[in-house]
Regions:
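Signature of the first transmembrane helix
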Residues: 3-60, 96, 152, 172, ...
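Membrane-proximal transmembrane or re-entrant/amphipathic helices at the cytosolic face
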Residues: 234, 428-477
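Interhelical loop/hinge segments that connect adjacent transmembrane helices in multipass membrane
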Residues: 4, 138, 165-172, 181-222, ...
Length: 477
């Protein structure tokens, strides 16, 4: 359990690092490039993500799981690693070839698409799945921390006006590529040489495609929404409003879903050893963790966004506020589906049920986007995303009904929902009355956190009581 906690903290640090960089740069970039520049970047980047998606064909999740299966068997681990690396080079190369002959050479944003080819190359050399599979998250954090800091400095040095969009894209894509490439420095000590003739790349194709299908579906409500806003409205600013709203929600989401990345290899390894009860014990704790964090984060974001958005993004981003309020529920929905899907169904090999859930979400999201975006623009996309995530979570609850009694779990954790609602009512009333400033936003966060924890203490929640007892014990020592 100690290793899981350490890996969670390392992975949490890594995920926060990935998202904290745009959080640091966003106030500056949103003012420098403007809503149109941000919208152009988001729109072109959403298209590039399709080529990365098809190039990787599910290899990230599959690679993480397969390495987890053989993490303690060095020879098998060597073979699996090199087989998957070769397969990845082949598939991403095909995707890159198609990319150059379609968008990069002939697209409307040719120069931006050309620079963003580095993103596709970055996906080719990405081996983070290997370190996640062997449950070693420390190396990922340290190496990428340095690269990300360099990226932030480059943005502040070179991006000075709305005409510097290409320079911004270079800073983004180059640091992504160098960050992934740098992880190879550890490989000589962790992976041995193998004979090429002894490798069988072909055997991995079918299982990766099985995992690839749900990823295609997932991309519809993680990437296609931005593409559809741009295509259906033709207003680049609307893409920016949606992108910025999602960005804030995703930063909060990182705290919760990081546990899924850590738990997946552990559950896969335990399942292989037939320790089913241990698996379920871990997941019940995951549910409690999600209820404890996700609900106050969701209601907290909805309560403070009217005070936060004006000073953080600057003028011209008022529509980000309703975007955040509407899309905030995905914090809870994705956190729950992360447990049932990423932490349970995938590691134990129940891909069909996982695929069913995300395909359902894909269809729902696409149809809702077609109906809502033309009428409500970015807000319509936000509504569609929430409905889609609700359908994914609903299907997964149904598929795991014999393994977990979700309603019993929800009832056992209802105190977190009640405490979050109490906090929301007070902060939602207070926030608009205060002048928009960094001090007042943090004041709302501190007051909200105090109300949430105080309410849990009043109703004598076990988690809070245990935490207080541990603190008392340590102080006593």
């Amino acid at each position: 359990m100690d290793k899981i906690v350490k890996n969670y903290l390392y992975n949490l640090s890594y995920q926060i690092l990935i998202l904290i960089v745009p959080l640091i740069t966003t106030p500056y970039v949103s003012r420098t490039l403007g809503a149109k520049g941000i919208g152009t970047f988001s729109y072109t980047n959403s298209i590039v993500q399709y080529f990365i998606l098809f190039g990787c064909i599910g290899l990230n999740l599959y690679g993480q799981r397969e390495i987890a299966y053989v993490q303690h068997e060095q020879e098998k681990r060597n073979i699996v690693f090199w087989e998957l690396v070769i397969l990845r080079i082949i598939t991403v190369s095909i995707s890159l070839f198609i990319y150059f002959f379609t968008l990069a050479a002939h697209g409307t944003y040719a120069s931006i698409f050309l620079i963003m080819s580095l993103d596709i190359l970055a996906s080719m050399v990405d081996i983070s799945w290997f370190f996640q599979g062997i449950e070693d998250f420390k190396k990922i954090v340290i190496r990428n921390f340095i690269i990300k800091i360099i990226g932030v400095l480059l943005i502040f040095i070179f991006v000075k006006s709305a005409d510097d969009l290409c320079l911004y894209v270079i800073c983004h894509s180059a640091t992504l590529f160098l960050g992934n490439l740098s992880m190879w420095a550890y490989i000589p000590k962790l992976v041995g040489r193998v004979r090429l003739r002894g490798l069988s790349v072909k055997k991995h194709v079918r299982p990766t495609i099985v995992l690839f299908l749900p990823q295609i579906a997932t991309s519809v409500y993680t990437v296609l929404d931005k593409t559809m806003i741009g295509f259906l409205t033709g207003i680049e600013e609307e893409v920016a409003y949606y992108e910025q709203g999602q960005k804030i929600v995703k930063i909060a989401m990182t705290l919760v879903i990081s546990l899924g990345t850590v738990m997946m290899p552990r559950v896969a390894n335990l399942f292989k050893q037939h320790q089913t009860e241990q698996v379920k014990s871990y997941l019940v704790k995951s549910f409690r963790f999600v209820f404890f964090l996700a609900f106050p984060m969701m209601f907290g974001l909805m309560a403070i966004c009217s005070n936060f958005v004006p000073w953080f993004f600057g003028n011209g981003y008022n529509r980000v506020v309703p975007n955040i309020i509407v899309i905030a529920p995905i914090l809870v929905l994705i956190a729950l589906s992360n447990i049932m899907g990423t932490q349970y169904l995938l590691p134990i090999g129940r891909q069909k049920e996982y695929t069913l859930s995300v395909v359902t979400g894909c269809i729902v999201n696409f149809l809702m986007n077609l109906i809502l975006i033309p009428k409500f623009y970015s807000i319509g996309a936000a509504i569609a995303t929430v409905i889609a995530e609700a359908s994914v979570t609903g299907v997964q609850i149904f598929c795991t009904r014999k393994d977990f009694c979700f309603w019993k779990i929800a009832n056992n954790n209802k105190q977190y929902v009640i405490s979050s609602l109490v906090m929301f009512i007070i902060i939602y009333t207070l926030s608009p009355k205060l002048q928009s400033s960094i001090i007042n936003t943090f004041l709302c966060i501190i007051i909200g956190g105090g109300i949430y924890l105080g309410t849990l203490l009043i109703i004598k929640d076990d988690t809070i009581i245990e935490a207080i007892e541990k603190i008392k014990t340590r102080i006593g020592k």
